[in-house]
């Protein structure tokens, strides 16, 4: 390669070991590079990338205790700090399957195992740069958003039948899939498979068939591809999505469990798996996954308060299914988790999330009246766009406190956001649909119970009315009108069951703290006086 060309290329070397950096820098100088930048960690590397348009990045996988090479590459791609012609090569002494699969998934330009010699480094770097130069028009058009032009440039190279023909063929297939031209992609990939091209051609064929919803054919191809190291992760990802789209959520979850063992650093996949656990009503598994995400995302571009909040939300969901003692222990853990959260992230930036979480925490502790009071104090049904998980949690909080309007407000807000076409968004959309169906079913059930209780009261079957109003109040413990109806029916009875008394106590607490219209306030005082004489067990509540 022309020495003058190499002398003008900007190279960044990222390694946490100073002697290793010095050794590799010497090799780079021997190759002919003169503009060599060095970074000992990801923070320095990102800073250099922000200041300079680099042509080549040589990055160690293990960068110490902070962000590693995988996370750095992910960050640079996400922030668009790598221009279309920049070559990114990972170097590592690690050959573990987890690391190799993770690197394959991110698709750097090359991966070099340590230790390596000067001739090996030179050969690999020159090869990567030549390929990048030969394919530059494809990359430039693609990065500019002109997929059709990128395909045309790929065809030009394919017709030339030179040393980068295979790479151009692969890029063309990926461009067809990216553009959503699935029938054309299927025809193209089938031709490549018939020509015995590498295994990626068969994966492209499977994806194009899957996107046309021919699930049986796609399943067969994807299952075969799981046997190849190169496609072990991606084929299983698509296989899990296939089962998800078929409605087999348990099988999709099992496949993602295996994939996350192969390549654990992919945070969107971990979140998708947690969502599948929630859809399978395995709240304990979802909590474990979100706990794992908190650790895995640390130092990465995915590190956020939402990871901690999602963990806390899952603990509350799981606690609602547990026995009282286990529930108390679990909810105590939520408090500790929130303490850790506010030490790392500004409480002001997540004030609404924390408020909603406190409301749900009070509901889970059996204090719905306090929860409703807290929500009313900070209520803000605004068009502000919150994180998807925040909207779903807000919908749950409003439903649990009996505010159907507030619940559906956040359901609508969330639905507007779920417009991407990927596995994670699909799982979020199904979670929302499932929650909405649950709300609608409970709401219809409550309407029926209230009607049955009202009919019983009008027919002077007061004992029956109390039982049904009590059942309805357990489902909607923060509805003042329902609480008042229960107390009214109780004034007509000579006695109620032991199961009804806790519900009645909650009704009294709710009505004592809730802002009531004058007519409702007068009725409440009237019922209080009657009940204090009839039921001595309620007197402490009334004085409180």
Tell where the protein language model's regions lie, with residue ranges.
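Alpha4 helix (beta4-alpha4-beta5 surface) of REC/receiver domains from two-component response regulators
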Residues: 70-71, 84, 94-110
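Conserved acidic segment of CheY-like receiver
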Residues: 7-19, 24-28
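Flexible loop/N-cap segments at domain edges
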Residues: 183-411, 424-431, 441-459, 486-495, ...
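Receiver (REC) domain switch/output surface
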Residues: 121-132, 137
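Conserved phosphotransfer microenvironments
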Residues: 59-76, 84, 393, 496, ...
């Amino acid at each position: 390669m022309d020495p003058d060309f190499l002398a003008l290329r900007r190279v960044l070397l990222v390694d946490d070991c100073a002697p290793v950096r010095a050794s590799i820098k010497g090799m780079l100088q021997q190759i002919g590079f003169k503009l060599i930048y060095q970074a000992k960690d990801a923070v320095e590397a990102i800073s250099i990338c922000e200041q300079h348009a680099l042509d080549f990045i040589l990055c160690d996988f293990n960068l110490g205790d902070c962000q590693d090479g995988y996370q750095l590459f992910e960050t640079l791609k996400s922030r668009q700090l790598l221009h279309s012609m920049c070559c990114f090569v990972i170097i590592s002494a690690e050959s573990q399957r987890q690391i190799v699969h993770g690197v394959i998934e991110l698709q750097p330009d090359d991966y070099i195992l340590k230790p390596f010699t000067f001739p090996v480094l030179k050969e690999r770097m020159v090869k990567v740069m030549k390929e990048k130069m030969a394919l530059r028009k494809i990359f430039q058009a693609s990065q500019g958003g002109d997929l059709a032009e990128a395909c045309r440039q790929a065809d030009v190279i394919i017709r030339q039948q030179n040393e980068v023909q295979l790479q151009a063929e692969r890029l063309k297939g990926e461009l067809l899939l990216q553009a959503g031209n699935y029938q054309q992609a299927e025809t193209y990939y089938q031709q490549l498979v018939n020509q015995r091209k590498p295994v990626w051609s068969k994966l492209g064929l499977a994806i194009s068939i899957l996107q046309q919803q021919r699930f049986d054919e796609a399943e067969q191809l994807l299952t075969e591809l799981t046997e190849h190291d190169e496609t072990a992760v991606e084929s299983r990802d698509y296989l899990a999505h296939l089962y998800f789209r078929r409605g087999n959520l348990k099988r999709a979850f099992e496949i993602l469990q295996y994939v996350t063992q192969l390549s654990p650093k992919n945070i969107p996949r971990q979140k998708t798996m947690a969502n599948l656990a929630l859809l399978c009503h395995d709240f304990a598994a979802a909590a474990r996954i979100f706990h794992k995400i908190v650790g895995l995302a640390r130092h990465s571009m995915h590190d956020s308060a939402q990871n901690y909040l999602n963990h806390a939300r899952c603990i509350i969901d799981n606690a609602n299914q547990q026995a009282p003692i286990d529930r108390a222990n679990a909810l105590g853990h939520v408090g500790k988790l929130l303490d850790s959260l506010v030490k790392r992230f500004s409480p002001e930036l997540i004030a609404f999330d924390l408020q909603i979480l406190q409301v749900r925490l009070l509901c889970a502790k059996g204090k719905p009246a306090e929860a409703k009071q807290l929500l009313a104090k900070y209520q803000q049904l605004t068009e502000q766009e919150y994180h998807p998980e925040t909207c779903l949690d807000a919908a749950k909080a409003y439903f649990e406190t009996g505010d159907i309007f507030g619940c559906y407000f956040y359901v609508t807000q969330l639905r507007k956001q779920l417009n991407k076409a990927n596995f994670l968004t699909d799982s979020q959309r199904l979670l929302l649909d499932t929650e909405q169906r649950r709300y609608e079913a409970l709401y219809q059930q409550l309407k029926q119970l209230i009607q049955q209780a009202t009919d019983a009261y009008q027919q002077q079957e007061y004992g029956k009315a109390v039982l049904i109003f009590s059942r309805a109040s357990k489902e909607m413990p923060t509805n003042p009108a329902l609480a008042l109806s229960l107390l009214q029916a109780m004034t007509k009875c000579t006695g109620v069951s032991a199961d009804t008394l806790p519900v009645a106590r909650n009704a009294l607490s709710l009505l004592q703290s809730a802002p009531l219209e004058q007519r409702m306030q007068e009725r409440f005082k009237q019922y209080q006086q009657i009940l204090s004489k009839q039921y001595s067990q309620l007197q402490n509540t009334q004085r409180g």
